Design a protein with these regions (language model features):
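Cysteine-nucleophile active-site neighborhood
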Residues: 1-31
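Amide-donor transfer/coupling interface in amidating biosynthetic enzymes
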Residues: 26-136
Length: 136
């Protein structure tokens, strides 16, 4: 939503792939200036990506959808969901179970197994990110 408003193009993956479950991301140098430590893998729930809007700064990238986090001034856009809770994940994977049939989507049980591995680092990242964003 934010990326589209900033002039980025939103698109489906050319091969119909989705990111549904946990996937690795890589912070850029600019991303490491925002938060020094990023989670290795983050929770995703999407089948669309977006191009880097004109004038935006790439903060993190991924393999299936390259643009994972951007900044433009004080506005940030994330492709991933560091805010996801166990209840949200249960609801999304129950009501949106058809998404797990998309190419590249992870099986439902791995969402919960991977959450036990990656949730702490994603939450720690989110705490630091929000604190720095609020302080400006």
């Amino acid at each position: 939503l934010c990326a589209k408003h900033l002039g980025g193009k939103v698109f489906n993956h050319p091969h119909g792939h989705a990111e549904v479950g946990y996937y690795p991301i890589r912070p850029t140098v600019a991303g490491l200036e925002v938060v020094e430590t990023w989670p290795e893998c983050v929770y995703q729930w999407h089948r669309e990506g977006f191009d880097l809007p004109p004038g935006a700064e790439l903060l993190a990238e991924g393999d299936t959808f390259e643009v994972q986090a951007i900044r433009m001034g004080r506005a940030f856009a994330l492709q991933f969901h560091p805010e996801v809770t166990h209840a949200m994940m249960h609801r999304w994977t129950t009501h949106g179970h058809e998404r797990m049939q998309l190419p590249g989507a992870r099986p439902r049980h791995t969402h919960f197994v991977d959450r036990a591995v990656y949730d702490y680092s994603a939450r720690a990242w989110l705490d630091v990110f929000l604190e720095r964003w609020i302080r400006g």
